[in-house]
Amino acid sequence: MPKIAVLGAGINGIASALAIQERLPNCEVTIIAEKFSPNTTSDVAAGLIEPFLCDDDVDRIINWTSATISRIHEYQADGNPGAEEQSGYWLQSVKSEPKWLKLMKNVHILTDAEMKQVARRPEHKFGIFYTTWYLEPTPYIKWCTDKFLKNGGKFKKQKIENIDDVARSYDVTVNCTGLGSRALIGDKEVYPTRGQILKVSCPRVKHFFIDDKYYALLNDSTITLGGTFEAHQWDLTINSELSQKILKENIHNIPSLRTAQILSSHVDMRPSRGTVRLQAELGRSLVHNYGHGGSGITLHWGCALECAEIVENVLKMKKSKL
């Protein structure tokens, strides 16, 4: 029975492991990580489904996102929490209608009259209303984890310092360590983009609101207010002044947030990279799936399915050489 190690237990690690099990049920899959949910970078995310801070081929982005949307429908069909449609406004200083909008529902370019009603700043010159989804990572990761364990998967808590030491014990190793890949495999193309957010409660807010700098995104019982996009910043200290600014600026966009109850503040680092690295490494039984920027939730299932296919091909190549 082939043995597969998946390094990293965020949403891309657990999804890749589960996709491998489903595609290759004769394999033994082990997830190895130092941190597990709810203490991963994924758990901090609001789970808005749309590509964000991810510069990659648009067709790949659309295919991966489409697969994730189908996955959300499957998750919803089981009556699980933390996944629902959300509608709202994207206001822009420069007009943009990306191709991925075709995956969204109820897309409507705002008229001048509509813009006058929703614009809050001089830079709010163009706007789009649409319906997308949110997928709250923590309950979803638990759902995936339950499936993974039911399929015979294993977990191993370990700080990974040398990938070759791990790889010796497995037929294929899958690297889903995100920003950790910078130190683990020496990929200097992956870097942190610091993000600080607030979680608040405000039932009066019914629509998401995104502009060039700030956002308010809906979840089941909370709203995520952001945010910051600080490239190459490693500081995980919560800046209280910045939290106040995030709240103030979102209130400017959505006056109803004046009544919001602040629940918590969070900061983490998005694993940014010029493109997602989803490939087998030549000459090694090593597959990479990392560098999703701010789109880890959005792209996760499409990338996981492709990752599983790559793992299958690596195993076939190894078998053919025997």
From Swiss-Prot:
Span of the signal peptide: 1-17
Gene Ontology CC: cytoplasm; peroxisomal matrix
Short sequence motif named Microbody targeting signal, residue ranges: 320-322
GO molecular function: D-amino-acid oxidase activity; FAD binding; glycine oxidase activity
Entry EC no(s): 1.4.3.3
Entries under Pfam families matching the protein: DAO (PF01266)
Regions crossing the membrane: none
Primary localization class, coarse: other
InterPro entries: D-amino_acid_oxidase_CS, DAO, FAD-dep_OxRdtase
Regulation: Inhibited by thiolactomycin.
Binding annotation for FAD: 9-11, 34-35, 40-42, 46-48, 159-160, 177, 270, 293-294, 296-298
Key words, A-Z: Developmental protein, FAD, Flavoprotein, Glycoprotein, Oxidoreductase, Peroxisome, Signal
Similarity comment text for this entry: Belongs to the DAMOX/DASOX family.
Protein name (database record): D-amino-acid oxidase
